[in-house]
Amino acid sequence: MKNTKTSQEQVIELKLSDRQKKVLKSIVDEYTISATPVSSKLLVQKEFKDQSSATIRNEMMFLEKNGLIEKQHISGGRVPSLKGYDFYNKNLINKNNNVSDNFKMRLHKILSKRYSNIDEILNAAVSIINETTQLPAVVTKTSSDELLKRIDLVKINDNSALVLIVTSSENILTHSIKLDKNTKFNDLQTCFSVLDERLVDTKLSLISSKLDLIVDIVRNKLEEVEYYFSKIVHRVFDFYAYKPNIDSKTYGVKYLTKHSEFEDQQKLNDLLNLLEDSTIWQQIALNKKTDGLAKIMLGNEIGHEHLAIATTQINLANTNHQITVVGPTRMDYAKIKALLDFLKIEIEKILGSTNEH
């Protein structure tokens, strides 16, 4: 019978003894710090002083046979494989990893300041994440549930006008409109004035479905109302009905030079391409599986073999902000996860969350 289990399911099912788990964890932790293949001799010196080198070698052979560690170079040391990192993150990661008092103090200082909006708070917080992890991060803002606070129409010239939409998160969205011979600016302004009166505090994503209810109101004030709604108004708001507003920004790219992996130009290019690929950040931001605490995704999950990401979603009243730390597979997962979890919990606690933990 054909085995249909995925490699991740097989990792979870793999049974290791307590000593084998400790050996694997020691290899991951040591390699994270040193970036050097780990030998049985080193493990005995540091973690297993009451064990012989032969015993630890046998345990390492078992781990290698099961694909959890691998030989990287000619040297006798071993490094974690993707399968090994996956097992580590699911079973061995230190869930009680303490966030430093310095990080807590700096974050609380940011949250106590009177910033104008959440974007400025996150910009300041992510800079601390960059500095602490020595890794870049991507912040993705999804605002499909923003509320309409004001809508206005501004005439640019005889041939064009600009729709201004102010949202509940203080974003100002603009849409340009061409004015042809069949379009009277004053009539169009009447349409948008009624929308401004009737649709305040409506979700942008729902406005398109409510426009038909507004037509009868406008019809009492304006002839040819169907023309203006079908040709112009619907086009403006249909955009929000089908496509949430997603914006991504990258911070801390300068820290890539701190990591030996990126002395390899190909690996550096791979990461830079990932950072510039807006589609993957949109997919992560729209993935509701990241609503909980920090999620770790390895190279085989994101299509980049030598890279990994740790991501968390901060849920506020009308916007979601995805913060994703990006780096080599040899990153300090426990530390990064603890930082992201703390950041999420503190910001949602102070600014208000749409979810409960």
Swiss-Prot record:
Keywords: Repressor, Stress response, Transcription, Transcription regulation. Negative regulator of class I heat shock genes (grpE-dnaK-dnaJ and groELS operons). Prevents heat-shock induction of these operons. Pfam families: HrcA, HrcA_DNA-bdg. InterPro entries: GAF-like_dom_sf (IPR029016), HrcA (IPR002571), HrcA_C (IPR021153), WH-like_DNA-bd_sf (IPR036388), WH_DNA-bd_sf (IPR036390), WHTH_HrcA_DNA-bd (IPR005104), WHTH_transcript_rep_HrcA_IDD (IPR023120). GO terms for biological process: negative regulation of DNA-templated transcription. This is Heat-inducible transcription repressor HrcA. NCBIfam families: hrcA (TIGR00331). Belongs to the HrcA family. One of its GO terms (molecular function) is DNA binding.
